Amino acid sequence: MLGENLKALRKQRGMSQEVMAQQLNIVRQTVSKWEQGLSVPDAQMLTRIAELFEVPVSSLLGEKIEEKADTDEIAAQLA
C-alpha cells in the first residue's frame, strides 16, 4: 500500500520519479523500488516524503490514495 500511495501522490503532483528523487537527495531507482514494494523507506525518509507531499505520515501508510483522473480523460468519457 505504501508503494501505491507514493506513486499516486507523485502522479497527482505531476512529478516524475527523477524529480522526486532529486528533491529527496536519493537516486531514481530507490523511488522505483519503493513504488514496486521491493524496499521501504526508513522512518526519517518517510517523514521527509510526507513533508514533500504535505501529508501526514499516517496517510502514506494508511488507506490507498486514489489517483485523480485526468480532466481530458473525463471529457473524452463524457463526449
Where are the model-predicted features located?
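Alpha-helical transmission elements in cytosolic ATPase-linked domains
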Residues: 1, 33-36, 48
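Cytosolic nucleotide-binding catalytic cores of signal-transduction proteins
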Residues: 4, 22-25, 43, 47
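Short basic helix-loop element that most often maps to the first helix and adjoining turn
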Residues: 4-19
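Alpha-helical residues within the helix-turn-helix
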Residues: 11, 22, 51
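Short coil turns linking two alpha-helices in DNA-binding domains
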Residues: 16, 27-30, 42, 56
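Recognition helix of helix-turn-helix/homeodomain-like DNA-binding domains
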Residues: 24-40, 63-65
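DNA major-groove recognition helix of helix-turn-helix/homeodomain DNA-binding modules
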Residues: 44-59
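Charged, helix-prone or intrinsically disordered regulatory segments positioned adjacent to compact structured domains
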Residues: 57-79
